Amino acid sequence: MSRNSPLQSGQRGPPNGSPYPDSSQNNDTFLSRIFGLNSVYNHLQENYQYYDPEFDSTYNQQVLANSQRQDYDLFGNGLDKTNLLDSESDSDLSSSSSASPSVVVKPRFKRTEASDNEDDEVDDLLTSLSKPRSSPPRRKPTFNIPNARDIFSANGNTQATSVLPLYNQKYRKPVERDTGASAGDSRGYANSGIRRTNGTRFVIPPKERALYLWANITNMDEFLTDLYYYYRGKGMLNIVLSSIIDLLILVFILGFTVFLKWGINYRYFFDNYKDSTYITLADLIIPNFLVDEVPLLAKFFLFGFVCYIVLRLIQLYFNYNYKLKEIKNFYKYLINISNDDELMTITWKTIVERLMLLKDYNSLTSTTSHFDGATDHYINDLNSKVRLNAHDIANRIMRKENYMIALINKDVLDLSLSPFQNSSFQLINNKSVLTKTLEWNLKLCINNFAFNNEGQINPSILKDFNRNQLAKELNSRFKMAAIINLILCPFIVIYFVLLYFFRYFNEYKSNPASIMGLRQYTPYAEWKLREFNELPHFFIRRLQLSVGPANTYINMFPRGFLVINLMNLVNFISGAIMAILVIMGLWFEDENHSFWSFELTEGKSTLFYISIFGTLWAITSTSTSTSDTADNLNPNSHSFVYDPEASLRYVSQFTHYLPSSWNRRLHTVEVKNEFCELYSLKIIIILNEIFSLILTPFILWFRASSSSGAIIDFFREYSIHVDGLGYVCYFAMFNFEEKDKNMMFDLNKRKGKSKRSRRSKTSKTSSKKTVNEIELNNIKSKRREKAKISDSEDASSLPNTSDDESGNDLNADTYQDEKMIKSYMYFLESYGAGKADVRAINSNNKLLAKNSVISNIDPSPSLIIQGPSDNHSLLDSAYNINYKFDDAEQEESTRPGKKSGVLGMINQFYKQDLGR
């Protein structure tokens, strides 16, 4: 769906004609999708008085000059100058009776009349509201947005303020089109013919700009996402510098590679080196090698990289000028974070709390009645309001990631290597095949297809009759991505090999064992271990806390006597040879002779062999010192307890991953090997990334494309509409009371089959009925135990039934409920929920887990937290979930993928990789 690209605050209109563009004009162009011009937060009004950001630097001087002449209050006469966050939560944004034009909240009236009569009804409504009423007087507004034209001018005169126009101008008083209005008129901003004359320039104070931005947001998802990534990027300066450094690294790798390949005369170097001729680097550089030596194909790709770098620089400029500056202004004046350095210490929970205090200052999120006589005025429907609490903010930021988490955990994506995998080659398995490269391609193909430009799910996916057509389109999208990856594969492989070499060489030189011995979680493990609605910084912190316990658990298992003894032998021999060479080099060193340059073999000096044997000694010594035998771990020490089972359970407190298949086997090597597939060696992950560049085209063509129908079905069946939030993933709503209708139908169908099979087998004897009752009680007790944070060890003690396949399906659905419970409990912990709330949730979850096995009633609203309600609590929402897909609300949008382009998708996913 194309979006209008509104003018930013720093743009000016043409001097003649209508200086402002029509809001209905389609500005979705190729360049706008690349540079992000269509991704702004609010659409400014047609008659809004624009200003020049270049004069913002004089704002403090103007305030100082005006304060010396008159003590003017920016927040209305007679009101205290208090911080916005300290004001009342139900503050009124409407103008006072003396302000013109008045801001009227959108009424609720039945659209039963013809469209031609709507304007007359609005005019009658506005006329009636402008007349004096006998109803109780309105409350005095606690906040009033002044007009910048009337506050600051060149002559320094201050005049009466007026309210800036809100986004919804349909229910505002019609603006006057009198072009002869004086500059001092309080309604001057409504005139489309106003121009700057006689050198008069107007500016809007930064705080009012931030308030206007917040009051007129139309894309809450994008604004909150940018707000979060600004917090995660630690401020504007760090974000800009990081982007510039990334581009400089790219330029250096390209330039340095081209110089080493075509810029040096290696033949001249080797010929003169053998003859001991004195040469310098200037003698080896080929003049004009870019023109004469570089092949035409390489020049073509270099030109493409140059265009890409230029586009990235232009994109960075627009992001800085139109996004980062506005976000910085918002943090400074509304979130009350004056310095970006504070973002390094402040918690996200605090930012969410301060953001929630602003909900009454936005027409989309405000739920406060602004008039005492509320019955005499039209008010907005609260059910359509945009929700704004910790859960809603996380759902908006993680809307796409929640679907990806569910796709990986439910094994919807088939990424197996069965046609290519060799049993003797176990470097790449089905879990390690998901690399960053493949992950980026999957996001590029799925997210840009399933979601529109507004961040919402495309309505066509939610309709069952579009399933086959959409599956074909997604299949074609996967195959197109495979072709592009196959064409670019040689160049991407060379680039990443050089990138990894330059990045890790210094680390390898200083600590050779760091590359061979360090472990980290694989990309597959990151999606498998991530909870729903878990923001990236929470997830990264949780994984970092698990690194130490995970290493301790792995080191408890012996690697094998052959490997340990062989490494001890290599360590001793390499250390002995290196020691002799170093001693001889120090002993025979004088002015005439240098043992360091002595050639032990032809062309190889002593220093070469010292570096080789030193590397072997460092690697083997580190490996043997951290070997996982009981002797090396010193069991006599009081700080060590050799208990792999307890260690793995401690690791699961951070990873939240302890599948039931591991129960009773936590001490075995098989479980340790399965865990090592998730927590693998860093060198293996790097090799997998390089091999994945070659395998990605085949996986996309043969495997991912075959899952197109399952992906479409997943988005249709596991999408829930929430009023004020839109369509979100079912598992992200933490709805434990009931499952979705589609899920419930499949689960009841499988349970019905298992019950019928058990009845047929137990109808002969009454003793078997007793066994089945015990079985059902065990299943119920299992569901209650699985509602806890850690997995129950008694899950594997269930009696074995003949219908193992249906039991496995039931356990799979049970695991999804369990993961939702874990995600919800960790969500409460991350945002500092009280113990009383946690106890209430635990008590509810026990009942819900008990009833979820035999529940067949219609779906009901999601879990409501017990306890006193607080409008400003982080978790104060009870969602009204609408499971019915209303076709009237599902307007046919642009076919997915038609207007997003490759470069536009690259721009969309670039900010998701910041901070990785």
Swiss-Prot record:
Regions of compositional bias (Basic residues) in chain numbering: 750-762
Lumenal topology ranges: 260-293, 590-605
GO CC terms: autophagosome; cytoplasmic vesicle membrane; endoplasmic reticulum membrane; Golgi membrane; phagophore assembly site membrane
Biased amino acid composition, Low complexity: 92-105
Transmembrane region(s): 239-259, 294-314, 569-589, 606-626
Disordered: annotated segments: 1-27, 86-150, 747-814
Cytoplasmic topological domain: 1-238, 315-481, 503-568, 627-681, 703-916
Biased segments, Polar residues type: 1-11
Intramembrane region coordinates: 482-502, 682-702
Its membrane topology: Multi-pass membrane protein
Modification after translation, per record: Phosphorylated by ATG1. ATG1 phosphorylation is required for preautophagosome elongation.
Annotated catalysed reactions: a 1,2-diacyl-sn-glycero-3-phosphocholine(in) = a 1,2-diacyl-sn-glycero-3-phosphocholine(out); a 1,2-diacyl-sn-glycero-3-phospho-L-serine(in) = a 1,2-diacyl-sn-glycero-3-phospho-L-serine(out); a 1,2-diacyl-sn-glycero-3-phosphoethanolamine(in) = a 1,2-diacyl-sn-glycero-3-phosphoethanolamine(out); a 1,2-diacyl-sn-glycero-3-phospho-(1D-myo-inositol-3-phosphate)(in) = a 1,2-diacyl-sn-glycero-3-phospho-(1D-myo-inositol-3-phosphate)(out)
Gene Ontology process terms (BP): autophagy of mitochondrion; lipid transport; piecemeal microautophagy of the nucleus; protein localization to phagophore assembly site; reticulophagy
InterPro entries (alphabetical): Autophagy-rel_prot_9 (IPR007241)
Subcellular location: Preautophagosomal structure membrane; Cytoplasmic vesicle membrane; Golgi apparatus membrane; Endoplasmic reticulum membrane
Main localization, broad class: membrane
Membrane among keywords: yes
Keywords, comma-separated and alphabetical: Autophagy, Cytoplasmic vesicle, Endoplasmic reticulum, Golgi apparatus, Lipid transport, Membrane, Phosphoprotein, Transmembrane, Transmembrane helix, Transport
Family statement: Belongs to the ATG9 family.
Assembly notes: Homotrimer; forms a homotrimer with a central pore that forms a path between the two membrane leaflets.
Domain remark from Swiss-Prot or TrEMBL: Forms a homotrimer with a solvated central pore, which is connected laterally to the cytosol through the cavity within each protomer. Acts as a lipid scramblase that uses its central pore to function: the central pore opens laterally to accommodate lipid headgroups, thereby enabling lipid flipping and redistribution of lipids added to the outer leaflet of ATG9-containing vesicles, thereby enabling growth into autophagosomes.
Function: Phospholipid scramblase involved in autophagy and cytoplasm to vacuole transport (Cvt) vesicle formation. Cycles between the preautophagosomal structure/phagophore assembly site (PAS) and the cytoplasmic vesicle pool and supplies membrane for the growing autophagosome. Lipid scramblase activity plays a key role in preautophagosomal structure/phagophore assembly by distributing the phospholipids that arrive through ATG2 from the cytoplasmic to the luminal leaflet of the bilayer, thereby driving autophagosomal membrane expansion. Required for mitophagy.
Name of the protein in its database record: Autophagy-related protein 9
Native source organism of the sequence: Scheffersomyces stipitis (strain ATCC 58785 / CBS 6054 / NBRC 10063 / NRRL Y-11545) (Yeast)
Upper taxonomic lineage: Eukaryota, Fungi, Dikarya, Ascomycota, Saccharomycotina
